Amino acid sequence: MENNREGPYSVLTRDQLKGNMKKQIAEISEIFSLSKPDATVLLMFLRWDSHEVSEFLVENNEKVLSESGLKPVVVDPNQDLYKISSCGICFKTCDDGDYLISTPFCSHMFCKSCWRKYLEKNFYLVEKTQTRISCPHGACQAAVGPDTIQKLTVCDQEMYVEYILRSYIEGNKVLEIKYCPAQDCNYVIEFHQKNHDGADQEDYGFNVVCLCGHIFCWRCMLESHKPVTCNNASDWLFRDLNSLSKESGEKPLSLSSFETREKTYPLSSIKATKKVCPHCLRPADLGTKQYLRFLTCACNGRFCWKCMQPEEAHKTESGFYKFCNVSMTFEGRAPKTLEGRAEPENSCVGLWKASEVSLKQAKSDLQAFEESNIKNPSDLTEKDFTIIRKGLMLIVQCRQVLKWSCVYDYLHAEYEMSKREYLRFLQADATSLVESFSKTLNEEIGRASSATYENFCCVKHKVTIETSNIGNYFYHFIKTLQEGLDDVKVKSYDDYGGLFWLCDRCTYGNTWFHKECLMCSDDIAARVDLSDMSLN
């Protein structure tokens, strides 16, 4: 769905990553006739850059070996190495000289217990990896490599291997490698910088699809959030969504606040003289003019204050006003009040929640398909299985895009109402397309389980074509949103310049410091005089 080019990353297991690391060590060892422990120390010291290692070994061999700790340390001629029987840290005496261990480049001897404490405290349990592990002796720069570690316990050796692998992942300046952020996932992602188009992905990042099924943004490591930027996604998850969902999130709307679209109004400020406009669901205030029968909201909608029906419902064919029936409802529904109002289904939070339900269902369908194939292997080849799985995986991606398009909707200013309406149209069209594709795919999966090979060839071709079509559709859907829906003009005010922007709804001039129209966002609706209406 991103595009048709080769993916800029590879999904690897830890064993595959270890294999790549060992291969790199073996190449340096073979080319420059170094031992593998020394090659490991050199690569770790130069942050796994084989090209830089080659240059240093060719141009200044002695210098790089000395700086990395691979040159022997000058031993005190008066020191008798055979008489050393005590640890250099804890000073415990050992009868067996083999119990004390030193590096191949110095004569500083330490017991296994002190080696473990030193390595754990300064390297293994430290969050940031170092480019070199040196001898525990304070002034000694001798390198500690695999040949020294293999003299320690098995547990110490395993911890060292994990540390080297962590250095390969976190300290690698040639390859960009990250763990998949999904819970209980052990896959790692290797990023190919040569395929990366940094300018296009600077703000939005790009989606990574792990083999575990998790889709996330490489740049910020949050779940995939296109078409919004990484900063917008972070603000939404950790600030905006929390504030918007305090009363209308997982629980029913409480009486402590009233949420309408993106703005929250405390109920303490909404008096008995306020009701919800049946046209735009905004608070409308009758104020001191309680003798008025009809009220004009900021959205230009007029309604009866008693029965909440539109003004047209009170007119006869001759144009005269008739008595209103308070028991009547607006369009067959009960009058809306602030206390009993539920969250609008078309609000950003409501759409977000509905999209999350659909996304969970798509992930559940994908997991069910994989588990059924493991428990009850079918006659499908690996290629056929991949085609169907790719279609189910695409549905998950599309559902995630639709989910985050709700945040894109939330970010639009009030004066971009035309773009918002067009966005809602695109969302509805995309949702319909995904649902149709999902239904078709489930039908074809059912046929594939019982179809002959000849019939499945037709099924496979149909799934492949539709997967390609919907992938291209959503690629352009994302691109259209990221470009800001430029094809839609917000009336004539898009080209208006100066110190103010004009609201698309009421044409009020707002300063550029205000994202929402000050007039329309006011919780007090516009009021009309007696001269503006007829009273019975």
From Swiss-Prot:
Keyword Zinc-finger applies: yes
GO MF, one example: ubiquitin-protein transferase activity
EC assignment: 2.3.2.31
Keyword flag Zinc: yes
Residues noted as binding Zn(2+) 1 in the record, renumbered to the chain: 87, 90, 111, 114
Domain characteristics, as noted in the entry: Members of the RBR family are atypical E3 ligases. They interact with the E2 conjugating enzyme UBE2L3 and function like HECT-type E3 enzymes: they bind E2s via the first RING-type zinc finger, but require an obligate trans-thiolation step during the ubiquitin transfer, requiring a conserved active site Cys residue in the second RING-type zinc finger. The active site probably forms a thioester intermediate with ubiquitin taken from the active-site cysteine of the E2 before ultimately transferring it to a Lys residue on the substrate.
Protein's name according to its UniProt entry: Probable E3 ubiquitin-protein ligase ARI13
